[in-house]
Amino acid sequence: MHDELVWIDCEMTGLDLGSDQLIEIAALVTDADLNILGDGVDVVIHIDSTALSSMIDVVAEMHSRSGLINEVESSIVDLVTAESIVLDYINNHVKQPKTAPLAGNSIATDRSFIARDMPTLDSFLHYRMIDVSSIKELCRRWYPRIYFGQPAKGLTHRALADIHESIRELRFYRRTAFVPPPGPSTREIAEVVADLSGTPATPGDIDSAYERPNG
């Protein structure tokens, strides 16, 4: 069974796929229990001064405060090299393509830039994604005490630090919002399925609960 998760965070000059540029990408791989495998990678990508100067003020201030702009200007790494570095690290821990979901916070935006600029990396990842922000939004609606009690974020706006915070956040939700291992019994699962489908649970339902596809 392939249970690894590939955590990626990107920093860009903005959120417009038509004009903005990818300037930093970091990756960490975890196992199913959210243990980090290896040291991860954090790569700053060079872009020209024209692209940097086109950033809106709030983004330019954020990246200047974090030190990222200076690192972008001094970097000699292009997109192709950055993609290769990230894939080399991931391949050390994920041996089969299209088996590990992409994980992170509001990860759809990051994936859009990855798909545009790093298609080999994008195609290596499973099409499914695990978005921690989705769990956050559900907790806000269903378990507000958990939502308001979540760990404070550092807001560094640097890719690798943001991944560590996302992993910590999911660990928090696992311990507060999810049922503890090993989860409900087979009978309890069958009873919930029966309740949701409006039909009584039968012995066959209970016996076959382990065998149902999880799609």
From Swiss-Prot:
Signal sequence segment: none
Disulfide bonds: none
Enzyme Commission (EC) number: 3.1.15.-
GO molecular-function terms, A-Z: 3'-5'-RNA exonuclease activity; nucleic acid binding
Record's keyword annotation contains Hydrolase: yes
Chief location: cytoplasm
Keyword Transmembrane set for record: no
Name recorded for this polypeptide: Oligoribonuclease
Exonuclease domain: residues covered: 5-170
GO annotation, cellular component aspect: cytoplasm
SMART domains according to UniProt: EXOIII
HAMAP family: Oligoribonuclease
Active site: Y127
UniProt-listed CDD domains: Orn (cd06135)
Keywords, alphabetical: Cytoplasm, Exonuclease, Hydrolase, Nuclease
Family: Belongs to the oligoribonuclease family.
UniProt xrefs under InterPro entries: Exonuclease_RNaseT/DNA_pol3, Oligoribonuclease, RNaseH-like_sf, RNaseH_sf
Organism field: Mycobacterium leprae (strain TN)
Job of this protein: 3'-to-5' exoribonuclease specific for small oligoribonucleotides.
Compartment list: Cytoplasm
